[in-house]
Amino acid sequence: MPKFELTADYSPTGDQPEAIAQLTEGVLQGVPAQTLLGVTGSGKTFTIANVIQNINKPTLILSHNKTLAAQLYGEFKSFFPHNAVEYYVSYYDYYQPEAYIPSTDTYIEKDLAINDEIDKLRLAATSALLSGRKDVVVVSSVSCIYGMGNPAAFYDNVIELKRGKLLDRNVFLRRLVDSLYTRNDLNLERGCFRVKGDTVDIYLAYSDNLLRVTFWDDEIDAIEEVDPVSCLRLGSFDEYRIYPANLFMTTKESTAKAIHQIEDDLHKQVSYFEEIGKPYEAKRLYERVTYDMEMIRELGHCSGIENYSRYFYGREAGTRPYCLLDFFPEDFLIVIDESHVSVPQINAMYGGDRARKKNLVEYGFRLPAAMDNRPLKFEEFQQLARQVIYVSATPADYELQQSEGIVVEQVIRPTGLLDPIIEVRPSLNQVDDLMEEIQQRIEKDERILVTTLTKRMAEELTDYFMKHDIRTNYIHSDVDTLERVQIMDDLRAGRFDVLVGVNLLREGLDLPEVSLVAILDADKEGFLRSHRSLTQTVGRAARNVHGKAIMYADRITDSMQKTIDETNRRREKQLKYNEEHGITPQQIKKGRKMTDLISANAEAHAETRAYIEPEERMAVADPIMEYMTRDQLEKSIERSRKLMQEAAKKLDFIEAAQYRDEMLRMEEMLKEK
């Protein structure tokens, strides 16, 4: 059984050895909850990686957003290159959930776009967990508490191959279809297979390569890994497991049984609506569910099939759904990163989902069973989380209570860097004062973060700085995950010097080039100016040797005073350690590529964000398009889709948008044919 093998160019220093020893001992002794209170830049991720190596248990790293999950995924990939480090986040590039607003009688239909690459990574994560390996780390967002397929059904459809084993080729093909692989001899894509005589090529749903199985009569003659483009052999196997192409596995028998139960519940709910005087809702529900059942009978699926998931998996009403945590063995560890944010987020997921579904059920859009397609309740998550390490620079009361006083502090940074100096300055003329500070930093090729209280103020401040020739960008809630990563990379690369934001400059952002953090209206008590928020924001300057934070305020609030006192306490401890060990603070130097998953050569991107003509001529501009047959149009649409996906992978969103628009226009033309 493979063990975790940590690879790093450095060894634990400062507080790290003690923190690693305490956390390891706690996990091995079965302590249910511990807290790692680590300051920004103290190497919390490296500490956790050492703990994982010591305990050798499958581990779930839970982060509160995709950007930080991607950052952690890249770091753990580099620490454990020889082990299974997987990534599990929502696979939607865009998701508009189904909803009904009674006040305006507005029904909003579900709309989504699935990211094929992330779908592959999700399948790779579940496949690694069910392989029986112990050396598995899964980095996840809160998607891990959302409903998914039954792990037992997924495992039952695993196909085990062995060279020399007797297996009829046609039986093998039927098993592939049962595992939701599709035969396509012309265009082999992920999740498909093709047959050429005695050779079967399978494009595994969780891999970038093909698996080639060669038969000699009814015997497996060879099992090989093949490059999908060059068809060169990459390796051979004596044994191999093929995991299903989809996380949501069902059988014909379970589908037939589910349809019968759904129709029974439909008649009960329709009768209920008629009894309470809601004939319109009864009619709507009957028509919608009847149509869905016809679609499932004919095609095997329907829009919104997840709302019937309870029937397919034989769950009782009100029981919790299966989720990623069910794929882990019983003896596993959960590490909750930035726990002061992640824990409340886990707690809030169920309530938000239930409020939306309640209207859909009450007004006849969905059966009551739709309520069981949901994220875990917080109590259900607690029951599954048998051993947890909470990681935060500012742990909340919940984590401290759960840990029952077991708090491991990590204050010393391996680089010798100190917590930033905090200055409080009056808010009068704060913008002019800040501009002087910014100019000083720009001369030293350093970066600046500015946090405001409102989105409007962030926009106006950005415009003001730009008018004064200060290269500025601002980040807000409308910026999607990939673009946010690109903005961070651009800041680090020096394409602009100042980043302005509201509540998006706090937890986990790894920006060593930032030497100044300016907090405007620091004395306005509230969520954005609480003790924890201020401490996290100040911490963004802690990775730079010249780190400094300026709070613009007319009075010192309790939250400000707590932040200043705690920062000074840590700074004093760090100074003392540096003096005792003869350490001179060193600037952190990190590669500018944020993750293995979301990476691009930033130099390849144009400075402008304008919508430009692509190098290739847009297909819909060609007059010959109007005379194409349906088949020709479909091929052109598929080509545009692939080009769009390739551009998105390179983070070239402008070109991707062009191909998307081209594809949508051609789809409109196809409808008219």
Briefly describe each language-model feature range.
Residues 1-5, 440, 576-658, 663-673:
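Acidic, low-complexity intrinsically disordered tails
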Residues 1-590, 597:
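ASCE RecA-like P-loop NTPase motor cores
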